[in-house]
């Protein structure tokens, strides 16, 4: 085990002893918020310290076995115990490294997923619709709840822009690496000469704020406009100004919601999306500062970065961040994203482990 990792584990062991002393003192319960905070910290640390205790016991067992090697009668038993002990040490070290990885506080949150058509005109809008179906089907496989918060349909049946809210256990942890540029190479339905075109969409994945109030938004910084929702018409065509557009003046972020017939619900949804976008911008600014000292390949979330290509003639999907190519395009577009999600998660963890070992 690297000394830097052992040092971190020793610090956690001492911290657990400190927490036990503080929590058992009579003064602790006088401040219930502080008491709960100490309890949460202890709950996070205790399993790691217990693992480290098991690791140190395995080290001690190996030392005892090593000492028996000098005894001819005990040598065979000692060699067997050393072999078993080495396997156990390796397994415990891997567990400890994973336990020490920094936890993303947003991993268990619900999320907003935005798909915007980029270069490619109508074809880009159609691809935005394909991505919407891909993510919706993936979410359904995970038994997550999906709802369209806002949409701007295109003439041919795709979307210029669409925002999904996805709610479910671990939703953000699995989809957070989808932010970036998604490129498609295929023959468009509007193409008469059979030529392959390249189009692009941008995907943004943002954790939902626990509470809109948790994001510091000054009401004086908002311009709120209401207007009549646009649509294809029919018996439920909107006769009132139920659509809502909120502009956050300091950042220029604009959110429109018109999918509900209630202005109140549209406004609440727009505020939720606005809070998530502001929080997301703050997070990306922080990540950009951190990236100046350490480049994180998978987790950069740079929206201008081309992260994936979907090549229809070859039936392949390539994720450029991890050089992974899968020849299962049809399955991926039907929501079979597990192989991509798992590979991206492993790469991110390897990146974190490298930083941990160097710390």
UniProtKB/Swiss-Prot annotation:
GO terms for cellular component: cytoplasm. SUPFAM superfamilies: Release factor (SSF75620). The modification N5-methylglutamine is found at residue 235. The keyword ATP-binding does not apply. GO terms for molecular function: translation release factor activity, codon specific. Keywords: Cytoplasm, Methylation, Protein biosynthesis. Coiled coil: none annotated. Signal peptide: none annotated. Peptide chain release factor 1 directs the termination of translation in response to the peptide chain termination codons UAG and UAA. Belongs to the prokaryotic/mitochondrial release factor family. This is Peptide chain release factor 1. The lineage of its organism: Bacteria, Pseudomonadati, Pseudomonadota, Betaproteobacteria, Rhodocyclales. The gene is prfA.
């Amino acid at each position: 085990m690297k000394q830097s990792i052992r040092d971190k584990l020793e610090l956690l062991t001492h911290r657990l002893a400190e927490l036990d002393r503080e929590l058992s003192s009579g003064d602790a319960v006088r401040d219930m918020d502080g008491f709960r905070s100490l309890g949460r910290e202890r709950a996070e640390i205790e399993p790691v310290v217990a693992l480290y205790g098991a690791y140190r016991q395995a080290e001690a067992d190996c030392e005892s076995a090593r000492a028996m090697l000098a005894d001819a009668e005990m040598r065979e038993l000692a060699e067997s115990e050393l072999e078993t002990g080495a396997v156990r040490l390796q397994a415990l070290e891997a567990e400890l490294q994973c336990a020490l990885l920094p936890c993303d506080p947003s991993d268990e949150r619900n999320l907003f997923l935005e798909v915007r058509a980029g270069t490619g005109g109508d074809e880009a809008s159609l691809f935005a619709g394909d991505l919407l179906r891909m993510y919706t089907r993936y979410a359904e496989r995970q038994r997550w709840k999906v709802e369209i918060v806002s949409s701007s349909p295109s003439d041919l049946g795709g979307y210029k822009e669409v925002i999904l809210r996805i709610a479910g256990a671990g939703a953000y942890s699995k989809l957070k690496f989808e932010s970036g540029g998604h490129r498609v190479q295929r023959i468009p339905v509007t193409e008469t000469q059979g030529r392959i075109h390249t189009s692009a969409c941008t995907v943004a994945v943002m954790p939902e704020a626990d509470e809109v109030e948790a994001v510091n938004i000054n009401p004086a910084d908002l311009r709120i406009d209401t207007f009549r929702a646009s649509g294809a018409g029919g018996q439920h065509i909107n006769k009132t100004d139920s659509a809502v557009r909120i502009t956050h003046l300091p950042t220029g972020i604009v959110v429109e919601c018109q999918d509900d017939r209630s202005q109140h619900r549209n406004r609440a949804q727009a505020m939720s999306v606005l809070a998530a976008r502001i929080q997301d911008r703050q997070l990306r600014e922080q990540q950009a500062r951190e990236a100046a000292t350490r480049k994180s390949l998978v987790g950069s979330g740079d929206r201008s970065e081309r992260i994936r290509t979907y090549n229809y003639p070859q039936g392949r999907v390539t994720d450029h961040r991890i050089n992974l190519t899968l020849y299962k395009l049809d399955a991926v577009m039907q929501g079979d994203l597990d192989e991509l999600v798992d590979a991206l998660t492993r790469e991110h963890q390897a990146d974190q482990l490298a930083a941990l070992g160097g710390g």
